[in-house]
Amino acid sequence: MTTRGFRLDQDNRLNNFAIEPEVYVDSSVQAGWTKYAEKMNGRFAMIGFASLLIMEVVTGHGVIGWLNSL
């Protein structure tokens, strides 16, 4: 007998953990490297490299020289 999300077992005891969610299986196989993650990683790498070049042009020093001057 089911009433608003509760279920009674054969001894008429309340069992509110008896309703289980529907289980599904995703058939697509994906490891940690997805296309979206690779695109984002590439974009951030390009932004970082461009920032490095801009900093070198503006300061006139390379990264190693700039870090040594700190």
Swiss-Prot record:
Top-level taxon of the source organism: Bacteria
Chief localisation class: membrane
GO molecular function, one term: chlorophyll binding
Membrane topology, Cytoplasmic segments: 1-30
Pfam families: Chloroa_b-bind
Motif (Chlorophyll-binding motif): 38-43
Compartment(s) of residence: Cellular thylakoid membrane
Membrane topology listed for this record: Single-pass membrane protein
Key word Thylakoid present: yes
Record's function text: Involved in photosystem II (PSII) assembly and/or repair under high light stress; probably important during long-term acclimation to stress. HliA-HliC heteromers associate with PSII assembly intermediates containing CP47 (psbB) and bind chlorophyll and carotenoids in a 1:0.6 ratio. They probably protect against photo-oxidation during assembly. The complex binds mostly beta-carotenoid, but minor amounts of echinenone and beta-crytoxanthin are also detected. Accumulation of this protein requires HliC. The complex efficiently quenches chlorophyll fluorescence, contributing to photoprotection.
Protein's name in the database: High light-inducible protein HliA
Species this protein is from: Synechocystis sp. (strain ATCC 27184 / PCC 6803 / Kazusa)
